[in-house]
Amino acid sequence: MAQEITGHYVTIDNTRIYYDECGKGIPFFCIHTAGASSLIYRYFLPIMADNGFRVIAPDLPGHGKSYPVNWEPFRNMHQYAEFVWKIAKAVCGGEKPVVNGCAIGGDMALDLACYHSEECRAVIAMQGALQTKTFPDVSEDEQTHACPGWQDIFERAASMAIYYPCPPERVRELRWHHRFNGQYIMAGDGQTWVSQDCRGKLKNIKCPIMLFKGEADYYVPEKLIDETLAGIKEGLGEKFIGKKVGHYPIYEEPGYAAKVVMDFLKRKKVI
């Protein structure tokens, strides 16, 4: 029987932040994808909880049930990641977490590894790389009048980046995950994605880190994964190419993604 997911709130820098929690044990902190919410992890959380983790997945600022910081979206990856780290510190009870991020969350996870690796047990960066200038400039599209078709465009941008064939109901659910966050916030996420720049910082990573790329994902070419891995000290980093998954492994095939993560953590003697 799957463990129950419960909802909680925490206040960070006068900003009310929502997070899902499931299970007990070592903190396993999950950072969601651009324009979505913690819902993207709804199938993954109970599986990791059954593996002995206290799994935590916040709604990023301005997403889902979380308020934005100072009523503005983030537009810079490092600033975004530093705020998310404050969330992790507040909810992990003083314990070192395993940090797992996907897509924009994967970029954040990599940024956190560069700046806070000594405070992490391990990091899993799914669809994250040292640079991700792989999305158009959306800085002029924050307001609805600037791009009236934004919602459908963004939903398609998400649903086309998964592995096919995929059950139609899973595609519909993924589109819904990207339907209820405002254009203002989603455009901020797009700007944040292209601002990612960990060049020169990868040498600072001191904890085990896995770079996970879904084979069907076209937002992060394998070349970027290889360039990222090359900058990490030998023995700490691993690359994994996920079969029959795309941009959202933790949603598309949560059981498979969990097994890959568990195998990595055991191999690196994190657990």
Which residue ranges define each predicted feature?
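Conserved loop-alpha-helix segment in the C-terminal half of the alpha/beta-hydrolase fold
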Residues: 206-245, 251, 256
